[in-house]
């Protein structure tokens, strides 16, 4: 990242190490993925997993996956922006080889263009990440009230630094699957590169719908499977194992079906393996 001493070769080395990890997982990684028994739980490196007798295995799995996601983004925060924004040759090469040349900058521009420049309502940005794509737009909406939420405190800290001094913006830590917010609280919900990481996607769709006002806009972009074999391989064998992405993932048809059940007036597009859209509740 510019200003943090993260070079192009370091980005490439990071990606290569991730690929190697897919073929040669460490003993620790194998242990941390085994959560079927109390013994395996004690071997796990998850910090916030409580050792309780629980008949619902999905509760334990969700807690484990949430911690895995938090730790994954903490370990990668120094190269996160650089890879997404394709600031150098190596990150552009990575996007061309593994993501069919999809430009996240262009998709971010299209997503944010759904929000008028004179917007003065309420916005929920979840997950805000580091605010690398939204900083300029959110800062310009002086008459709006914007809530930026992320599960990762490390990502949130970077977003807070970027958005510091914007009195109309507040940053909060939280879980998209259990939003501590009133029903119909927001005019617009934005979710950029989030749903492919959320461990409980059903809850995320339900909660974002719940806090959105009638006639409100749900605007998002994220990975969908079935568009590129090499991208699907990367996601399934590396990103999911590292905790950056969390299965299950939707195909285009499955995602369209979900949105059609919840929303109307859907403007839906696909660029490579990324879907982006704007829906009206």
Language model features by range: what are they?
Residues 177-189:
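A short acidic, Gly/Pro-enriched loop at the edge of an enzyme's catalytic core
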Residues 188-200:
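A short SAM/SAH-binding and catalytic strip from SAM-dependent methyltransferases
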Residues 246-262:
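Short alpha-helix
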